[in-house]
């Protein structure tokens, strides 16, 4: 073997994987420019203004608890699932059913792009979350809420907030 002729073996990559990785990087870059991390009380006031207090029988504290355990109050949070779907925004809404991502064959029940869920003004996110909550399982649609908030005393989530 001659010096300098060795090169690492290149493994072929399926184009879909490369495109998914590129889309993931672009999504992260785009969302990071507009992301916002709310404080607990600031988010409580915003969600109250959107009418989530008492919506479908859930308290404002339920929503704040969900947002904390789903995203840490970060509007730009994006999580990639093993099945290729993504969870987006402060409530980590999944692209498998609720929003349009790269896969054109999803129901898109919220009739919006997943990137809309990264907007710090939360309007689209709240509209979609309200639609999800209309499902029979309500906030139970979110694993984070079921594991961390359901059936617990959540009063601390809004204590001290001037609402």
UniProtKB/Swiss-Prot annotation:
Residues 36-163 form the C-type lysozyme domain. It comes from Bos taurus (Bovine). This is Sperm acrosome membrane-associated protein 3. The gene is SPACA3. Belongs to the glycosyl hydrolase 22 family. Sperm surface membrane protein that may be involved in sperm-egg plasma membrane adhesion and fusion during fertilization. It could be a potential receptor for the egg oligosaccharide residue N-acetylglucosamine, which is present in the extracellular matrix over the egg plasma membrane. The processed form has no detectable bacteriolytic activity in vitro. The keyword Signal applies. SMART domains: LYZ1. The keyword Disulfide bond applies. SUPFAM superfamilies: Lysozyme-like (SSF53955). It is found in: Secreted. Residues 1-35 form the signal peptide. Interacts with ASTL. GO terms for molecular function: lysozyme activity. It holds the Pfam family Lys. Its main location: secreted. PROSITE patterns: GLYCOSYL_HYDROL_F22_1, GLYCOSYL_HYDROL_F22_2. Keywords: Disulfide bond, Secreted, Signal.
């Amino acid at each position: 073997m001659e010096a300098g002729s060795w090169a690492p073996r290149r493994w072929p990559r399926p184009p879909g994987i490369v495109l998914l990785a590129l889309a993931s990087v672009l999504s992260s870059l785009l969302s990071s420019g507009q992301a916002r991390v709310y404080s607990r009380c600031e988010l409580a006031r915003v969600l109250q203004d959107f009418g989530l207090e008492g919506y479908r029988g859930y308290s404002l504290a339920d929503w704040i608890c969900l947002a904390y355990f789903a995203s840490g109050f970060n509007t730009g949070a994006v999580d990639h699932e093993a099945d290729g779907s993504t969870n987006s925004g402060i409530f980590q809404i999944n692209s498998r059913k609720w929003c349009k991502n790269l896969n054109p064959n999803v129901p898109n029940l919220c009739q919006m792009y997943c990137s809309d869920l990264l907007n710090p003004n939360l309007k689209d996110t709240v509209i979609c979350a309200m639609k999800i909550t209309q499902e029979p399982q309500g906030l139970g649609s979110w694993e984070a809420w079921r594991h961390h908030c359901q059936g617990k005393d959540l009063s601390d989530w809004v204590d001290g907030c001037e609402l």
